[in-house]
From Swiss-Prot:
<dbReference type="InterPro" id="IPR009958">
    <property type="entry name" value="Conotoxin_a-typ"/>
</dbReference>
<dbReference type="GO" id="GO:0035792">
    <property type="term" value="C:host cell postsynaptic membrane"/>
</dbReference>
<keyword id="KW-0800">Toxin</keyword>
<dbReference type="GO" id="GO:0099106">
    <property type="term" value="F:ion channel regulator activity"/>
</dbReference>
<feature type="disulfide bond">
    <location>
        <begin position="54"/>
        <end position="64"/>
    </location>
</feature>
<protein>
    <recommendedName>
        <fullName>Alpha-conotoxin SII</fullName>
    </recommendedName>
</protein>
<keyword id="KW-0008">Acetylcholine receptor inhibiting toxin</keyword>
<dbReference type="GO" id="GO:0005576">
    <property type="term" value="C:extracellular region"/>
</dbReference>
<keyword id="KW-0629">Postsynaptic neurotoxin</keyword>
<dbReference type="GO" id="GO:0090729">
    <property type="term" value="F:toxin activity"/>
</dbReference>
<feature type="region of interest" description="Disordered">
    <location>
        <begin position="23"/>
        <end position="51"/>
    </location>
</feature>
<comment type="similarity">
    <text>Belongs to the conotoxin A superfamily.</text>
</comment>
<dbReference type="GO" id="GO:0030550">
    <property type="term" value="F:acetylcholine receptor inhibitor activity"/>
</dbReference>
<keyword id="KW-0872">Ion channel impairing toxin</keyword>
<keyword id="KW-0528">Neurotoxin</keyword>
<feature type="disulfide bond">
    <location>
        <begin position="52"/>
        <end position="68"/>
    </location>
</feature>
<dbReference type="Pfam" id="PF07365">
    <property type="entry name" value="Toxin_8"/>
</dbReference>
Length: 72
């Protein structure tokens, strides 16, 4: 194998590993859409724009429809 061919193979390997190891935002956004969505059932707002906690862990303290200082 000539020097030019070895350099070309080296560049192809570097390019392939860079593309494979580069994190894709498109793939992760699909999985996290509901977690980031503020209109999901775990994160609601009342008419004044204040948040309320609909998480079952804090639901007894801050029910949906009442304002709480901490939201998900």
């Amino acid at each position: 194998m000539g020097m030019r061919m070895m350099f070309t193979v080296f560049l192809l390997v570097v390019l392939a590993t860079t593309v494979v190891s580069f994190p894709s935002d498109r793939a992760s956004d699909g999985r996290d859409d509901e977690a980031k969505d503020e209109r999901s059932d775990m994160h609601e707002s009342d008419r004044n724009g204040r948040g309320c906690c609909c998480n079952p862990a804090c639901g007894p303290n801050y029910g949906c429809g009442t304002s709480c200082s901490r939201t998900l």
